[in-house]
C-alpha cells in the first residue's frame, strides 16, 4: 500500500511544471515566455491522464489535492502537495530542478529513482496550467502524464475541454482522462 501511495504522490507531483527537451518528447510544446514568478502560489490538481497501470486501476478513487509552488534556493521550485491518504492528510515536498529553457524542470522520482521531465505546456497564470510529464519507470517502461492545474476547485468547462483536447493530442484516450472530484478534506492547510 505504501508503494501505491508513493506512486500516487509521484503522479501528482509529476504533473506540476516545466519543459525539458528529451529525445522521446521533442515535440512537446511549452508556454512561450514562461514567467516562473507568476506560476508561484496555490494550485489544485483538477485533471489527470496517465499511461500508468496503477493510475488506470485507481483513478476512480482519487480526489482533488492542493499544491503550493514556491521558489527554491537553486533557482528551481519547491512543490508541496497535500492530499488525502487513508482518511488522513499527508504532505510531501518535491524539488523541481530548472533546465536551461524557462519553465523546464526535472526531478528524481521518489518511487522509481529515475529522472522525470516536466513541461508547462500552457498557462494563463491566473486560472489554469496544462502540464506534461515524461520519464522512464524502468527499462522499457515509459511514463507519461498530463495534468490540469487550476487556481480554483471548480475550473470552467472551457478549461476542462482545453485539458481534454491537450491530453488527447498526447495520445491519451477518453477513458485515461479523469477530472478529480472536489473535496474540502486536506485543503485548509494552504488557504
UniProtKB/Swiss-Prot annotation:
Stretches of the chain forming a coiled coil according to its record: none
The enzyme's E.C. designation: 5.3.99.2
Top-level taxon of origin: Eukaryota
InterPro entries, per the entry: Calycin, Lipocalin, Lipocln_cytosolic_FA-bd_dom
Family: Belongs to the calycin superfamily. Lipocalin family.
Disulfide bridge map: 89-186
Origin species: Felis catus
Post-translational modification: N- and O-glycosylated. Both N-glycosylation recognition sites are almost quantitatively occupied by N-glycans of the biantennary complex type, with a considerable proportion of structures bearing a bisecting GlcNAc. N-glycan at Asn-78: dHex1Hex5HexNAc4. Agalacto structure as well as sialylated and nonsialylated oligosaccharides bearing alpha2-3- and/or alpha2-6-linked NeuNAc are present.
Active-site residues per Swiss-Prot or TrEMBL entry: 65 (nucleophile)
Keywords of the record: Cytoplasm, Disulfide bond, Endoplasmic reticulum, Fatty acid biosynthesis, Fatty acid metabolism, Glycoprotein, Golgi apparatus, Isomerase, Lipid biosynthesis, Lipid metabolism, Mast cell degranulation, Membrane, Nucleus, Prostaglandin biosynthesis, Prostaglandin metabolism, Pyrrolidone carboxylic acid, Secreted, Signal, Transport
Listed name of the protein: Prostaglandin-H2 D-isomerase
Molecular function terms from GO: prostaglandin-D synthase activity; retinoid binding; small molecule binding
Reactions catalysed according to its record: prostaglandin H2 = prostaglandin D2
Comment field on protein domains: Forms a beta-barrel structure that accommodates hydrophobic ligands in its interior.
Metal-binding is among the record's keywords: no
Function text: Catalyzes the conversion of PGH2 to PGD2, a prostaglandin involved in smooth muscle contraction/relaxation and a potent inhibitor of platelet aggregation. Involved in a variety of CNS functions, such as sedation, NREM sleep and PGE2-induced allodynia, and may have an anti-apoptotic role in oligodendrocytes. Binds small non-substrate lipophilic molecules, including biliverdin, bilirubin, retinal, retinoic acid and thyroid hormone, and may act as a scavenger for harmful hydrophobic molecules and as a secretory retinoid and thyroid hormone transporter.
Residues the record marks as carrying a glycan: 51, 78
One Gene Ontology biological process: prostaglandin biosynthetic process
Location in the cell: Rough endoplasmic reticulum; Nucleus membrane; Golgi apparatus; Cytoplasm, Perinuclear region
Pyrrolidone carboxylic acid: residues carrying this PTM: 25
Secretion signal span: 1-24
Assembly mode: Monomer.
GO cellular component, one term: Golgi apparatus
Amino acid at each position: 500500500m505504501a508503494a501505491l501511495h508513493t506512486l500516487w504522490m509521484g503522479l501528482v507531483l509529476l504533473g506540476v511544471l516545466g519543459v525539458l527537451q528529451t529525445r522521446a518528447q521533442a515535440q512537446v510544446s511549452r508556454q512561450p515566455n514562461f514567467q516562473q514568478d507568476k506560476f508561484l502560489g496555490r494550485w489544485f490538481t483538477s485533471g489527470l491522464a496517465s499511461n500508468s497501470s496503477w493510475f488506470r486501476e485507481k483513478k476512480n478513487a482519487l480526489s482533488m489535492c492542493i499544491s503550493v509552488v514556491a521558489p527554491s534556493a537553486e533557482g528551481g521550485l519547491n512543490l508541496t502537495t497535500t492530499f488525502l491518504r487513508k482518511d488522513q492528510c499527508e504532505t510531501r515536498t518535491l524539488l523541481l530542478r530548472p533546465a536551461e529553457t524557462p519553465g523546464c524542470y526535472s526531478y528524481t522520482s521518489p518511487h522509481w529513482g529515475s529522472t522525470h521531465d516536466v513541461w508547462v505546456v500552457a498557462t494563463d497564470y491566473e486560472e489554469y496550467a496544462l502540464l506534461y510529464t515524461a520519464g522512464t519507470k524502468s527499462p522499457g517502461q515509459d511514463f507519461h502524464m498530463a495534468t490540469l492545474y487550476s487556481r480554483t476547485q471548480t475550473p470552467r468547462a472551457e478549461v476542462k475541454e482545453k485539458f481534454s483536447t491537450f491530453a488527447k493530442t498526447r495520445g491519451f484516450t477518453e477513458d485515461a482522462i479523469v477530472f478529480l472530484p472536489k473535496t474540502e478534506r486536506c485543503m485548509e492547510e494552504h488557504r
